Amino acid sequence: MIPGSSPKHYKIQKLTSLDKDYRQRARSLGSSSAKAKEWGCFDVSFLTLPPVIGEISITYTVMFQTDKPLVPGDKTMTLFKTTVDYVDIVSIKSKEHLAGVCLLPGALQRHGKPIGFAVQIFFDGQEVASDSVEVGILAGRKSWWTDSKIIDSPNVATREGCLVDRMKSPFQLNDLDSYEVSR
């Protein structure tokens, strides 16, 4: 068996909660900006069993809901999704790993509050772990991110490019050694 190929080798421990924990201000380095903008930061803490895994992919899905769209014609729910590839996952000193994504400040302001955050971990194209947190109308709807009745609903807009790898955000230097390295 290839190290990392079994779902038994992975366990998702914790996802960012959907209360105010996800809102973070980016540090301002040499900027004259009067006020740092808030980003939406969504992290996953997970365990791996093999000492070294060459590469994994994590798909992050976040659903937001707003009662009053800021732009006329906007839908009340917005789905953000991205996949990030991570390399050289080493579990020699610690089996716990941390990875994450950030939602751009403009998207955070425009689309309301998160009602669902889901993570899927893939090894060699096969899903080996998944988990989610949900509130509001998604509460109790496990695997909502794969349910076409939800994600393809006429009330849901899908937005590309707004959810970015943490290592490609202003948070890349915050607690750098705690996060896995993306490709």
Where are the model-predicted features located?
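Exposed aromatic-hydrophobic patches
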Residues: 86-106
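N-terminal non-globular segments
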Residues: 30-32, 57-61, 68-75, 100-102, ...
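Short beta-strand elements
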Residues: 77-90, 118-183
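A short beta-turn/strand-edge loop motif at beta-sheet boundaries
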Residues: 48-56, 68-72, 110-111
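Short, compositionally biased P/S/T/A/G/V-rich stretches that sit at domain boundaries
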Residues: 1-35, 154, 158-183
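Contiguous beta-strand segments within globular domains
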Residues: 29-46, 51-57, 96-103
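Short glycine/proline/serine/threonine-rich loop/turn segments at secondary-structure transition edges
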Residues: 103-116
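Beta-strand elements of well-folded, non-transmembrane domains
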Residues: 44-50, 60-68, 123-125
